[in-house]
């Protein structure tokens, strides 16, 4: 059929258009079906966990769930003077209802994070429920207040009621503020946390210092090695690259254990240094920052070498030779002609190593000391030891946010298209 002889309005033209549209629809459907497994995998393994993490960082259901009537009674309270008798009546009703349930334990744990000792107050009060007068007579609101204060005088302290009032919502910035060494005072204003609780900004600072140091060490070692590999013949380059990739085939625990053997006081490194006469006493290389730097640099070095090598391999060697033939010094030609062309590899490698470094847990935990633990250690601590998912998610979410901000700033100022994939 010669389509050039078909009129635009003929039935054959309309049928041809329908067939073309159907073919395009089939192609789009096939493309979506091919991409669907990867999209579902990313959704379930990446998007949903991160979304859950960010959600748990601001969830605050314990008080609103266990004490709904009390929260409602305190909604109009000025938080300066003791609450009205109606608040005591509401608290008595709520605590009687949840006295023997799991909600009471969650309530006690949550309030104890606000005021140390609140857990014992909640437990003591729960044992006294329900409140009754003489001969099991019903109590008036004023008598209910008096009963609470008889159970424990702390119920007359405004601070304990403020802790309930400011956490009446299902969503709260409590954990995020705590991770930034801040808190809400009794009136809901954001203030600096107490000195004995202001530790997390220092931990974040330590994490980024270690990440930057490991990135610089990996760059200093990886750049010349990647350059040397790029100048080798293909056969020799493949052989050296196999040696570079060996750490990928070895468990992290095995590599860390090997460094423990090497760095200990009677290890190979100290033995060799003492035998050569360079030192007279063993160096302290374990359970401090030195051991962390050495092991993390070794483990992350391939992540720096691979992006650098891929970029260097694509740079024609004729550029440097041309610069030298025009009178440039060989080092000047290398520095001014060759190095700028490797910036994409430097950026990709540095970003990859840094992001991996700030999330490391097992290496600092085994080779570092108490002052060398990073944010990941405290995420694991709150997850596995104290079972404080809110704090763990807040620390993890802030670390993720800081990483994304640094990535965006890097891309903005360098104007390079560095991909994390």
Task: Walk through the language-model features, giving the residues of each.
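Membrane-topology segments of multi-pass transport proteins
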Residues: 1-33, 52, 56-201
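C-terminal transmembrane helix and the adjacent membrane-cytosol boundary/short C-terminal tail
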Residues: 11, 309-320, 324, 393-421
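Transmembrane-helix boundary motif in ABC transporter permease subunits
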Residues: 17-19, 23, 52, 214-245, ...
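Membrane-interfacial helix termini and adjacent extracytoplasmic/periplasmic loops
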Residues: 20-21, 185, 255-297, 367-371
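Amphipathic cytosolic juxtamembrane alpha-helices at the membrane-cytosol interface
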Residues: 24, 28, 237-238, 289-291, ...
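Interhelical loop and adjacent transmembrane-helix boundary motif
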Residues: 27, 66-69, 365, 370-411
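Transmembrane alpha-helices
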Residues: 40, 244, 298, 304-309, ...
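Transmembrane alpha-helix signature in integral membrane proteins
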Residues: 197-228, 339
